[in-house]
Amino acid sequence: MTANTQSQAIVRVVDDDPDVRRSWQFVIEGEGWNVLTYASALEFLEKDSPFTPGCLVLDVRMPGMSGIELQHEMKLRGDTLPIIFISAHGDIDMAVKTMKDGADDFLSKPVTPERLLDAIEKAVKRDARIRTESAALEQARAAFRRLSAREQEVATGVARGLLNKQIAYELNISAVSYT
């Protein structure tokens, strides 16, 4: 992990227990991470920005909106922030469900600081990779939109793996006219 990635990332901790929030904040900040804590899923949704890189350390069972309900809401909003679930009451079915729904990890309490920090590092690396890939994809889309309609047709043929002659035949043009 680069120091730049770590300094830009924010680890969000959402847990209804203030002692747990303070404890995890102390451990995570002690390793040089930026940390924001939230007492509930609703507070997280109201105050957090999905545009800031990092990850979410999330308790499964909380009053009001549960961690699993928050995961579902984030998915509906298109928020791709990696989630690390922590639970004292989790079971295999719950862990499998959260992972199938996109969670990065599911840790059972008690969790060692080393295990949590390892999960955070992996999640933040994945988030950085996703954000880089998304930015590159958006640049490619923007470049494609700047092409003329005919150039877009040719580019689509190339993307489909067609040969120049095949593209020319499909578009009823000379292969020489666009190569």
Q: PLM features: residue spans?
A:
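Active-site beta3 strand of CheY-like receiver
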Residues: 12, 51-57
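Conserved small/polar residues in nucleotide/adenosyl-binding loops
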Residues: 178-179
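Active-site residues of response regulator receiver
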Residues: 59, 87
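C-terminal output helix
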Residues: 91-93, 107, 111-120, 166
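Acidic catalytic/metal-coordinating carboxylates
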Residues: 39-40, 65-70
